Amino acid sequence: IIGAGYIGLEVAATAVQKGLKVTIVEMADRVMNRTVDPVISEYFDNLHRTNGVEIFLESALERFEGESGVEKVICTNNKTVEADGVVVGVGILPNQEIAESAGLKCNNGILVDEYGRTEDHSIFACGDCTNHPNFYMKKNIRLESVHNALEQAKTVALSLMGKPEKYNQVPWFWSDQYKDKLQIVGMSGDHDETVTRGSIEAGTFMLFYLKKGELIAVDSVNNPKDFLISKKLV
């Protein structure tokens, strides 16, 4: 598996449970590097290694080799992985070509306002391909998540029916790996304090991220009830 983000790790967990031998190649220095705190990365790294997954960190893909299909994965640090199947999960680029051809403004996605309208107010867009204003982040962002796609679709539908309501959602995400559930509300990274609740060793814990005393994000592992409460506090 190329990439140790949500997709790569979820596929790895499923493959292991189907009895397959799995190797992950990741160019960053930890799993889920772009989206979670190092504490969460370490927990899920250990979880996968405990389940028999081989993980090569700081290893970038150089090329594939094979006669009739992929037989070897060659990495830039001289590591070679024997393989009879490869899954690539390294992120996406938004499909914005149709918008560009229509003369609409794009910048890491199709630019829309809080009602889902593009530069041409007769054209709307929603989902992973849009770059939209987010009141919580206080800036424009492009999100790749089920929740965002669903809620943006509702916003666009209301606009089309002449009942416009501003998109007003705090981002949240989840990932199921083996029997473990990771749930996230808000986006950490800009915090100045972290509070841990529960037991990392027991596999049931939460990380609360604060900025100037205000709760801005929560990461929850195997604690769905408390997570539902936390969603209301961010």
Task: Report the location of each language-model feature.
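Active-site- and interface-proximal helix/loop "cap" or "latch" segments in soluble metabolic
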Residues: 230-234
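Mid-to-C-terminal Rossmann-like scaffold of FAD/NAD(P)H-dependent oxidoreductases
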Residues: 129-226
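Hydrophobic alpha-helical segments, especially N-terminal targeting/anchoring helices
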Residues: 25, 74, 112, 209-211
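Rossmann-like dinucleotide-binding cores of NAD(P)H-dependent redox enzymes
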Residues: 6-63, 145-148, 169-177
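Beta1/beta-strand and adjacent pyrophosphate-binding region of the FAD-binding site
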Residues: 1-5
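FAD-site-proximal beta/loop scaffold in flavoenzymes
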Residues: 68-74, 80-158
